[in-house]
């Protein structure tokens, strides 16, 4: 697979990080390395740590960043483990971190990966091909109620009960093995009015199953909290999200970390000792310009939130 990928909100991310030429930065979702390449171009004696759970992405990034090889350390891991990653590298706090939480275009476009509802492929959806849980396992073996729950909670799919019931009916007779088989089942469970809508009928369900396979939302919360704890004072954290579930988690983590004293107003003095960890730099998330959306439609749903360690 050719891992060419158009980075979203590239200039906005670089501005947000306020890169120091001698600083240490971490890209927790390396992907096509577009953001990382631009970070490297702003470094002199500094260092970039690139993290991705997808070995294909890491190999592609290694080639793309070859001119900056002396500045770059690549790590095969999940960004939720950012604390352990830094510790293993002999680091505690660094100058900035970037997380682009969207699935990269090459992953979506590679039919074999099973992320797309537009091409036939085995039900896989693993970002890390070394993990055991796949979309096949979820679709064929998870209880109907659990399926309904993930479709509703992770995909915000209004027809979750009907889709879960349809999946259960089919898998009772035979295993559901491919993406287009699943698409047909989803279509069969939806009313004609829903099938006429602009959005593809399988979009929400595929998002939900992908999130469950990769534990994406759990990784977001854990990763963001760890990232804040491992920033130097003045260090920046920039996070791009692509759907409301992720954005809500990032927003809540930021707001919680920005809080100071939590003692009741009736207390004459603070006894909790809590102080803000960060200052939120984006009251509202930064979104793509009209020009970027026209050039890269994927950027339409992107939101960038930025915080600074205090």
Describe the predicted segments one by one.
Residues 1-310:
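S-adenosyl-L-methionine-dependent methyltransferase catalytic core, i.e., the SAM/SAH-binding region
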